[in-house]
Amino acid sequence: MIAKSNLVKVHDWLWEIPRSHRADMRVPARVYASDHMLDQITTDRSLEQLVNVATLPGIVGHALAMPDIHEGYGFPVGGVAAFDAADGVISPGGIGYDINCGVRLLCSDVPVSAIQPHLSELGAALYREVPSGVGQGGRLVMKGHDMDAVLEGGAPRLVEMGYGEAADLERTESRGKLEPAAAALVSSHAKDRGRDQLGTMGAGNHFVEVGSVEGIYDAEAAQHLGLFKDQVTVLIHTGSRGLGHQVATDFIRGMVRAMPRYGITLPDVELACTPFASNEGQEYFQAMSAGANFAWANRQLITWEVRQAWEQVLGDAGGPLRLLYDVAHNIAKIEEYRVGPVSKRLVIHRKGATRAFPGQPVLVPGSMGTRSFLLMGGEKAMAESFGSSCHGAGRRMSRTRAKKEIQGAELKQRLNAQGIVVNVGKLSALAEEAPEAYKDVNEVVDVIHQAGIARKIAHFRPVAVIKG
């Protein structure tokens, strides 16, 4: 385990593990955190995992971690790493099993007082319309050419099918579609796992949450985005479901077998990788892109389902639900950055990290029952963090421990007492996502804000939560 004494303070919100810490490090490792947060971060293996990332071939700049960092598979969750597209690697562990897990924010034109009398009914309608839980199938079954069209067409394909509007695509990262996607490289097993999962939430930390704008930090930016105090919002958090998980599984196995051919040795096999320019690297990138497109299509269909429930309960009085933005936080993308005196094409791995380009909305959901934030990316992110920010509160307690220490029924009562309507399939699943199982999202966001990576625009309080 890496101790606090192993880190050098760069400034109040940024710490560095120098290359001299371990002989195999190719670049330093850096973590955004307050002094207080660092005490908690050093209690697990996440910084050791970050140091391992710093040993990978072709890594550029620094191995980075956001303040919501915690242990993951290979890479820590909250990790960001950039690799030279010409001679660097791509690693599925740096994207994660839930390819393009991400968040979208919908906004209404009504204050929360307008829906308060209908909140229980709205929660029940959302739970009915948005299938949730492990193994729960959705309203569409995608096979053959239909599945391939979604894998290569992403959210635009769902809009073509009538499940959304053109404006949704304008407000989605990459317009909801990555071009290198190749459906032919997604295994039949992965496609079979995903065939009835479009428009489904899944379980774990995925959710649909109705909230309201509780605080505004930047009035001009909020007005530009169409936000106002007490406005009703809806957050949707989910990803590529079983299909994305299977894509990751298939290619991790293949890369473990392929690495000896490229002379790659690793401190942890969970970092399995191949050169980005290799056949294996290119095939994974194209299959991962297909998985990302499936996730965007999934969130697009869930948006349609949420709008259906909204209209059923509120009718014309509810008005429209417009998409403010959709961001991915488990993905690899090709982006260009200045490295020394030259501009380079880099493979940016974001695992539990959100793109934060200047002027772009950055969505940071909190833990269940706590506030969530809307930030806006800044120029400093482009210079310091490869255009990346945090993605959430970050776990501080394992799911197993949370289930042992927290009673789902008691938690539901506590949330109800806070005025939050809860619709959940299994109470044990509720316990896994209790607020005390996560870090303080206020502190996470403050670090990012103070570091200048992204600035606070608004925060939301939950009034209804739907979980699997």
Each model region followed by its residue ranges:
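Short, conserved catalytic or adaptor-binding loops enriched in Gly and charged residues
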Residues: 55-56
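Redox-cofactor-proximal catalytic regions of oxidoreductases
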Residues: 80-106
